[in-house]
């Protein structure tokens, strides 16, 4: 198991991802963890336990769960296998197997092979621009399918932010200086795409640091939007963030 875990760690370092996260915490929900190396059926069983908890907790807030939006930093097999990418892969499947509607999003990092994974652009969802720091950048939406799970994954893409081969760290292991802008673009790209889909989620599950700007936008900029008016937020926190700070002007760039 240690040798297998080291292989995953090496794979992740090669494409500029921090060490494999080892802790997983759901804010306001019980602690859970999925060890690497479980068979698909075993992982799905553990996912279903979490789904039960999620459904009960949300029902206690006065809402039944029908639609769950997943905003992921990583999903296997598009990035190397790890705890966080396994959860991005199998948790939506577990929810879907309970007859719930799901939508999954992640960034379209440059290391993802579009031909191998059969990504294609969704023209009707692409075309808008997102302004960050007075600069317009086009939002491109791509989609691929995980056939074994009968599940679609939406990818947020932009040439400036997501076409580099490394994920979060440069070739010297340094945090990209524009990672804050990338997180902003990703969060707003997801929310604007969900609005275009006219798909109102009951629960929005954010996992991985690059998704953590999204709850702030929901509480502030999108708080009066009817698509998100009844959405509950679940935030998963990992130790996947390098010891780096966003630039001082991040707080200005996040405004729009």
Identify the meaning behind each predicted range:
Residues 25, 40-42, 46-57:
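Short, positively charged and aromatic/hydrophobic N-terminal segments
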Residues 17, 56, 64-66:
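Short, positively charged low-complexity motifs
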Residues 3, 7-8, 35, 46, ...:
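N-terminal hydrophobic alpha-helix used for membrane targeting or insertion
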Residues 49, 61-256:
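Catalytic cores of nucleotide-sugar-dependent glycosyltransferases that transfer UDP/GDP/TDP-activated
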Residues 1-19:
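Intrinsically disordered, low-complexity, charge-rich segments with an acidic bias
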